[in-house]
Amino acid sequence: MKFLDQAKIFVKSGDGGNGCVAFRREKNIEFGGPDGGHGGRGADVIVEAVPNLNTLIDFRYQQHFKAARGRDGSGDNRTGKSGEATIIKVPVGTQIFEDDRKTLIADLSRPGQRVRLAKGGDGGFGNAHYKSSTNQAPRRADPGWPGQEIWVWLRLKLIADAGLIGLPNAGKSTLLAAVTRARPKIADYPFTTLHPNLGVVHQDAREFIIADIPGLIEGAHEGAGLGTRFLGHVERCAVLLHMIDATQDDVAGAWRTVRAELKGHGQGLDEKSEIVGLSKIDALPPEDIAAKIAELSEACGAPVMAFSAISGKGLADVLRVMATHVDEARALRHARGEAEGDASDEAMRDVTGIDHGYNRPSAVVDWEDAPFDDDDDDDGDESGDKGQWTR
């Protein structure tokens, strides 16, 4: 399956159904009066995060989503059927942006989260609504209110616990294939990996997800190489394994290059927990490995873990350290979730507060049912008779 991590789609909620002009006609009832029903409400457009998807490829073939309109009202005061909501399913980790690609509408980071992108229009009033003491046979009915339409961008940021970063050919895909059942493309040339890959690691009765992203080069945050577009997929990671190829001459320079790109990308990536790893140690003699570890440790100011994804040497230690970071991050998220509560995640969120027919001027209630207004303005009839209040 092809990987696609961003897509632009058009959504339109359903229009409301039209109100009905009808009159009661039965035997021995000469003047039955109006009984036209209201139109049904248009369908909403809802986006839902589901756990069994990991790409936005489906939106390459369908970009327009239009919800059903409400059914028209009919006689005997029958309200039209409301439209059934259109559910757009997206992978967990999908962010929704406005057409400018900068304004975030929603971030669906948990399975089952929903957001209503477009609210269906109200149905129009039937003529029974307009019956009054002075107009007992109204022939007026309202059309349904139009739904909302909007263009949005979907951007997928994969949900992973740990991320693999480094220059091209640092051995990231080889490591992913060695510790998981993922089978990424592996070859001895730069930019073999063209899109992110995920795998599940099982280590000491624990499991976590790691993400392998395409390699970074100098100037990537300015668009060089494949750019930093794919760095978004490790923004949610608890820890980053920064892999440096032991066979290159300047291991300290390689570390500085990637760190500069992380800082240039922003989003706090340069502040994440980092494990510095020297890979491909099976290709060099022990004395060379020791010298490169010392050079790299001096540059980064932290311990360096040496390993080989081919021979497996040192790999278990790296995975244990990664698992420890992941466990700590999960415990922190769990404690934070208990403190804040998850009720807001379970409820469906509305994107906009735009009305689609609610509180319209034609909706009237009796004075007796209306909120009392005690200011000095003449808001209505002062005669004391039962009047009408427009909201």
UniProtKB/Swiss-Prot annotation:
Magnesium recorded as keyword: yes
Top-tier EC class: hydrolase
PROSITE patterns: G_OBG, GTP1_OBG, OBG
BP-aspect Gene Ontology terms: ribosome biogenesis
Cellular location(s): Cytoplasm
Positions bound to GTP: 166-173, 191-195, 212-215, 279-282, 308-310
Source taxon at top rank: Bacteria
Keywords of this entry: Cytoplasm, GTP-binding, Hydrolase, Magnesium, Metal-binding, Nucleotide-binding
Annotated Obg domain residues: 1-159
Binding sites annotated in the UniProt record for Mg(2+): S173, T193
Acidic residues: compositionally biased ranges: 366-382
Disulfide bonds: none
EC numbers, comma separated: 3.6.5.-
Domain OBG-type G residues, every copy: 160-327
GO CC annotation terms, alphabetical: cytoplasm
GO molecular function: GTP binding; GTPase activity; magnesium ion binding
Region Disordered: start-end pairs: 352-391
Function: An essential GTPase which binds GTP, GDP and possibly (p)ppGpp with moderate affinity, with high nucleotide exchange rates and a fairly low GTP hydrolysis rate. Plays a role in control of the cell cycle, stress response, ribosome biogenesis and in those bacteria that undergo differentiation, in morphogenesis control.
Family matches, as HAMAP family: GTPase_Obg
Subunit details: Monomer.
Family, per entry: Belongs to the TRAFAC class OBG-HflX-like GTPase superfamily. OBG GTPase family.
Protein name as catalogued: GTPase Obg
Organism: Rhodospirillum rubrum (strain ATCC 11170 / ATH 1.1.1 / DSM 467 / LMG 4362 / NCIMB 8255 / S1)
